[in-house]
Amino acid sequence: RWLLRDIEDRRDAMLTLYTEIGKTPLDFSVKVDVKSSNEEIATIIRNILELNATTQKSFRTPEKALSYCVTTLEKSDVLVFQAAKIDPSEMRGLSVAYEQMPIIVLNRKDEPSARLFTLCHELVHIVTRTSGICTDTAENSMSLNELELRCNQIAGMVLVPKSSIIKHPSIRDIQTYGFDDLYVNKIAHDFAVSKQVIIHCLWELNIISKQFYFETLNRYSEEYKTHQMKKSSKGFLPPVTDTATQVGKLYARTVLNAYYADKITARDTSGYLLNLKAKNFGKLERWGF
C-alpha cells in the first residue's frame, strides 16, 4: 500500500538525515511480553507517555493531551505521522515496531480524542512487538480480533486508570443521584478523553448496565453525527498546516536542520516535506521549533 511505502520512505530519510547532521537514533528498548497483564502493560505505557493524574487534569482537552503525548514520544525518536487521505473506516491507526525509530500513524480525519485513543492502542502494539494496520481502534469496538480488543482495553486503562476514576467525585454523584451527562462530561474533561471512553469505564466498573451502555453510546454517536453535519466545511488546509500535521515536528525539524546545515538542497527539502514550497520553510520552522 502507498501509505506503508511513504512512511517507510520517511523513516529511511530520517535515518539518513540523522547521519548527515551527526545524530544517533535512540534505541526504543521498551519491550513487554504480550502475555503480561493488561494492568502491567497500561502502567508501562503511562510511564512512557509520562502521564499522571495531575498532568492529565491540566490538559482539559483531548487536543492538548494528544499534543503532549506525541511530543513525549518524539523525544524518544518515535515517529508519529498522520494520514490525510484515508477514511477512518479503512484505517484508524498503524504501527511498525522498529528497535530504532518505531512508527505510529494516526488518521487525521479522526477527532483528537479518537486519535489519542488510537495512539495508546498503537503503543500497545509497539511495546509488545505486534504491530500492524488497525481498522477498529474505537473504545466501543465490537471487533472479534482478540488482540485488537485487548489493545483497546489497555488503551482505555492508559487514559483512564480504574484506580483514578473510582476516586472521581462525579462517580459518587452518579452512584448517589443516578446517571447524568453532566457527570460524564466532568469526568471526560478531567481525563481529557471522549465521553465514549468514560461510559465504557462505567460499564466495566458495573456502574451502568451493558444495555444502558450501548443505548447511551448510540445516543452519543447520533449527537456527534448531528454536530458534524452542522459544522461548516473548512475547505483546504494551508500548505504548512497540511504538511506539518502529516509529518510531525520531529521529522520536520530534522529535515529543516539538515537544510540549514547545507546537508541537503532546497529541492530535496521540499521533496522530504511533501513538496512544500521553499517560501514556506520559515513558517514550518516556527511551528516545529
For the regions a language model picked out, list residue spans one by one:
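Active-site hotspot residues in diverse enzymes, especially metal/ion-binding acidic/histidine motifs
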Residues: 1-289
